[in-house]
């Protein structure tokens, strides 16, 4: 890739990964972000020049300008590049260009679990094939990075459906974890439009194999809608109707055990990640690796080393009011994700009381899923509900934190982190486990605890 490329919004996890990948593929790379952070420091350590002011950037020196969704079309550097006729590419559009440097690409998409599933597959392939690479939307714990370029053979990518940018991509293999109602403004609040976009994605000429979870209603709807016979379509899940069925799921000493029926073989696996949903995610990766020709024994040995992605069921031990308490930090922010996480906590800690500290994320999500929240938020033994993290949205009347728990009783409303800690100090002991959850800044609460 012999190009000079400027990355705008390079302090974000997605664009920073592309900048590193481009550099390792031979491009001359520079980046801009108005705020320096740990990611920009990492880029500078790799020899990438970082600008924090538009004034020092000579846009005319670059062949391509790549920008994140956080960069407005009126941004001076983007406006200048367009006026000079320089090729300007949104993040996913550049990822599509980058993919052409690789022989084989596997895209993971879906409303929930795509980052975790991408991390599982990335961890497997990096052990099974030293020339495999990945670019995903979270920090893969196995590699302590969201990006690794080990060659130009196989590439694992996370394909984002939230803004329909996955339609720019042309992978050879697609894994769909599920299809659910989220980011519906992208699809004009139409489930059929959402399904049509997924259908368009898997119908691309480049796609040869499709794996989807038949336990999910959205995936079943896609199967009913999709009728092309020129691709290898494999369903997986706990359902007896799955092409690859999962069974014998159980937990022993906090390790997840399960089996799959693959073709005529019954194969057993162990996984450090908790919950039925992670078994589904892992199964998609297992069968993709089996179909690539990797040996069962090698996959099994690699799977037990999978530790997932940062902020997905991260485990800590904290001292709270003199008690040693297990604390879990999790990114889940949709009713389905909340329910799955609480179920996973129950499976792993069946004899402990679950205290759920939840920070809702976006008023629009509260509003759009208002009927689904009460059931999900009733599943823990005690709910502590924080104010909604706005993500720069304006407050929507009837969509604040207290509105998503209408009809529930026994929950505690906290007005901030200090208030939540006050409740935890009263409630927590050795017989409790605390799940701290949300996509906003609630992860900071984990660090504050027991300081």
UniProtKB/Swiss-Prot annotation:
The lineage of its organism: Bacteria, Pseudomonadati, Pseudomonadota, Gammaproteobacteria, Thiotrichales. It comes from the Bacteria. GO terms for molecular function: ATP binding; UDP-N-acetylmuramate-L-alanine ligase activity. GO terms for biological process: cell division; cell wall organization; peptidoglycan biosynthetic process; regulation of cell shape. It is found in: Cytoplasm. Pathway: Cell wall biogenesis; peptidoglycan biosynthesis. This is UDP-N-acetylmuramate--L-alanine ligase. It catalyses: UDP-N-acetyl-alpha-D-muramate + L-alanine + ATP = UDP-N-acetyl-alpha-D-muramoyl-L-alanine + ADP + phosphate + H(+). It holds the Pfam family Mur_ligase_C. ATP binds at residues 110-116. The keyword Zinc does not apply. GO terms for cellular component: cytoplasm. Belongs to the MurCDEF family. It comes from Francisella tularensis subsp. tularensis (strain SCHU S4 / Schu 4). Cell wall formation. Keywords: ATP-binding, Cell cycle, Cell division, Cell shape, Cell wall biogenesis/degradation, Cytoplasm, Ligase, Nucleotide-binding, Peptidoglycan synthesis. Its EC number is 6.3.2.8. The keyword Cytoplasm applies. The gene is murC. Its main location: cytoplasm. Coiled coil: none annotated.
